[in-house]
Amino acid sequence: MIFSVNARYTSWAGFFYSVFLGMAVALLLGYLYAKILNHLKLNEEIVGTFAGYSFIPVMNLFYTFAPVTNRQMLYPIGGQGLRPKVNLEPYFGQVLDRLWQVRIGELVIPAGLLLFFFGTGFLLWLFSKTRAGMIFSAIAENERFVRLAGINVNGYRTAAIIMSTVIAAAGVVVYSQSYGILHLYDGPFMMSFPAVSAIVIGGASPRKATVANALIGTFLYQTTYLLSIPVANALLIPEMAEIMRTIITSGIILYAFIFERKDMRNEAH
C-alpha cells in the first residue's frame, strides 16, 4: 500500500496494485515464516506471537528510511520518515465499500464489501473440500498418522502457512481501504487480538478453524463489544472504553484457552 500511494495510484488501480504486490511479498515472508514454524514445532503459538512482535520494530525502521517521495505520506518537518497514519481517501479509500452500495433510509449496506467477503469465504470452503484441504485438516488433527500415510507433512505445512500469509496480506488491504486510513509503525501491534478473539468465540480451536467459526465469531464478538462499551461508558467514565475493549478481548481469549485445555484433558482420560 505504501508503494501504491507513493505512486499515486487511485481507485481500483491502487487497490489491486496493493493487493497483488502485498501478496507477492507475503509469498516470500510466508515461506520464511513456515521454515521457522517447521523448525520449532509444538511451539507455534508462542513463536507466532513473538515473531509478529519482533517484526514490527523491523518495519518501523523501514518506515523511517523508506524511499518515498509523496509529501502527503512524509512528516512535514524534515521530509524524512512516513507518518504514523496515511489518509487513503484521495487514493483508494473505501473503493470496495462504495461498490454497489444499498441505501435503506439512513442505513448504508456495503454490498461490494460483503460480496467480496462471502465470496472469499466460499472459495476457502471449496478449497477445504479438495484433497489438499483435507490433508491440511488431517495434519492439524493427527500429524503422526498423516506422516505414516506417506505424506510430506512439512511440505503441506509450508503451503498452508504461505496461503494464510498471502490471504492475510490481501485482508489487510481490504481492511485499510474500508477504514480509510493506513496505520503504520505500532498500529498493527494489537490488530491480531480482536481477530483471534472473534474466531475463538466462534468455536475455533488450535486443531480446527472453519469459515463458519469466523462468521459466527465475528458476529458474536462485535455484538458483545457494541453492547458492553455503551454500558461501560454509562456506568464508568468515558475514558474507560478502550480499557474495557482490551479486557473483553483478552478475557475471551483466556476463556477459550482454559476450556480448550479442559477438553484436551477430558479426551486424554
What residue ranges belong to the model's regions?
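Membrane-water interface segments at the C-terminal ends of transmembrane alpha-helices
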Residues: 4-8, 42-71, 256
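Alpha-helical transmembrane segments within multi-pass membrane transporters and channels
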Residues: 10-54, 221
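Transmembrane alpha-helical segments in multi-pass inner-membrane proteins
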Residues: 20-22, 168, 178-246
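Membrane-interface helix caps of multi-pass small-molecule transporters
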Residues: 31, 35-40, 62-65, 125-126, ...
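Hydrophobic core segments of alpha-helical transmembrane domains in multi-pass membrane transport
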Residues: 53-60, 113-124, 164-172, 198-202, ...
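Transmembrane helix-bundle core of multi-pass membrane transporters
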Residues: 55-128, 236-241, 269
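Helix-loop-helix "hairpin" substructures at the membrane interface of multi-pass membrane proteins
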Residues: 103-183
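Cytosolic-side transmembrane-helix boundaries in multi-pass membrane proteins
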Residues: 141-155, 226-269
